[in-house]
Every structure is written in C-alpha cells, then in structure tokens.
Design a protein with these regions (language model features):
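Short intrinsically disordered, low-complexity coil segments enriched in acidic
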Residues: 1-8, 227, 251-254
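Short helix- or helix-capping micro-motifs
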Residues: 37
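Proline-enriched interdomain boundary motifs that mark the N-terminal boundary
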Residues: 1, 111-118, 224-230
Length: 254
C-alpha cells in the first residue's frame, strides 16, 4: 500500500515509484505490463491518456513512465484519504496475488473569492452607511469577507471613509465597514434610480477576487420644505387690492 499527495484542482501524474513493487527475481519493473486496476476511484477521475480507466484495465510501465496515468480530484475537492483505488503489479510473467491500495490525499489550496453586483438604496440628503451584507461575496471555503478594494470611483455623490474621500485602489477593511465608517452622501436635493455607482473587489484574507463587482446606489427622493420670501405689493387708495399667487414669495426645489 502507498499514499500519494495531490493538489486541489490540479491533475496528479503518477510515477512508477508511487506503486509498491517488489520481486525477488528482479530489481526493477519490467517494460511490459506493470499492473491491473482491481477497484476504481470513487470521487475523482483516474485517467490513462485522457480516457477514464476501467475496472480490470492493464496499465503498462511505459505508460506510467510517460506520465499518462493521472488522477484529478473534483473541483474544489480536498482532504486526507480523499480517494483510493486498488491494483496488482506484474513482473512480466504473473500478477501479484494480493491487491494493494493506493490512497490519494488532496492538499487544499485557497480558491479566489467572488464579488457580485449589488444595489443599495440611499435617501435624499442623508448619508448612507454601508454594512458588510451590502458587498456581494462568495467563497467555496466559506471564508468571511475581510476587505474590499475600490477599483473605480463614484462620479456624483461623496464616498467617505471616516470622513475622508475614498481613493481609487484604496483597501477598506471588514472592521471599518462593520464600524459604519464607510458612507455615501448624494448631492443636496439629488435623487434617482441608478444615481451613482462604484466598483470593488473582495478579499477572503488570502487573495482578492479576480474580477470587480459594481455597487449601484439608488437615491429615494424626499419632500423638501418650501421656502417663503418677503415681497411688497402696491395698492391704490380707496380701491380694493386683489392678491394673486405671484404676490407670495414661494420656492420649492421639488
């Protein structure tokens, strides 16, 4: 029996040293039939020259030396004792009596997180405070969002971190977002769907996402109070004066 170690998401190429072989008559493996697969893998793919190996298939020593026998774990699969198969060896005359087991451990590698687009809704004339849930984040290892990096800036309102303007390429930590330090404020009396946006990548503590996502900001309108202004009108002695609406100073941004 033997154990080999593969790497997550990477084909493992077997060598003859991976297969336990001993023969009192010879010191090296022969150049003809080397072994027979007696039980198959159950999780990944065992392939010979790109074709899945079948139960009872003979595999030559030359094929192994040529690097044609490979094992590929399932996407994102890893773990100790991840998979195994059994085999007999052949000295050119006869097979071994008892099959041996080749166990395959798969070492985990960090998978890049994924950033996803999102839309948040702010209120006119009010600062929007971002929370972690606003930033689309997925990770196959179920790691948590550790930071974002701003890759393109907004164009209309103001994006601030602790009161200072955010710059392109700036990394903003999970703790800053959780503390409510990242805010967006629309221009005064401004509103609308798709009012502004910025792009960002996400980080799982090891690596950034490969592509950016877009944070779109809608701004809901609120009624602005009207304003009155002083005015003077001129009446005529002994004559009733009739007011019109134009006589009353009135302004409303809405």
């Amino acid at each position: 029996d033997n154990t080999v170690t593969a790497t997550e998401d990477t084909p493992f190429v077997f060598t003859d040293a991976d297969f336990g072989f001993a023969d009192v008559d010879v010191t090296t493996q022969p150049e003809d039939t080397f072994g027979t697969v007696t039980t198959l893998v159950s999780t990944g793919k065992l392939e010979l020259n790109g074709v899945e190996v079948t139960l009872g298939q003979n595999i030559s020593h030359d094929d192994i030396l040529a690097g044609l026998l490979t094992f590929t774990p399932l996407k994102d699969g890893n773990g100790v004792g991840y998979d195994s198969f059994q085999f007999t060896v052949n000295d050119g005359i006869a097979d071994s009596l008892v099959p041996s087991t080749l166990t395959i451990d798969v070492t985990a590698v960090n998978d890049l997180p994924t950033a996803t687009d999102n839309t948040v809704t702010a209120t006119e004339d009010t600062a929007l405070v971002f929370v972690l849930a606003d930033f689309g984040f997925t990770d196959v290892e179920t790691d948590q969002l550790q930071s974002i990096t701003v890759t393109t800036l907004n164009s209309t309102g103001t994006l601030l971190l602790d009161g200072s303007a955010v710059t392109i390429g700036q990394t903003i930590s999970q703790s800053d977002i959780s503390a409510g330090a990242l805010t967006f404020t629309p221009l005064a009396n401004d509103n609308g769907a798709g009012y502004d946006s910025f792009a960002y990548t996400v980080n799982d503590g090891v690596a950034d996402s490969l592509t950016s996502a877009t944070m779109t900001i809608d701004v809901t309108a609120v009624n602005d109070l009207p304003t009155s202004s002083d005015n003077t009108v001129t009446a005529t002695e002994d004559t009733p004066f009739v007011f019109t609406d134009a006589d009353f100073g009135f302004a409303d941004v809405d």
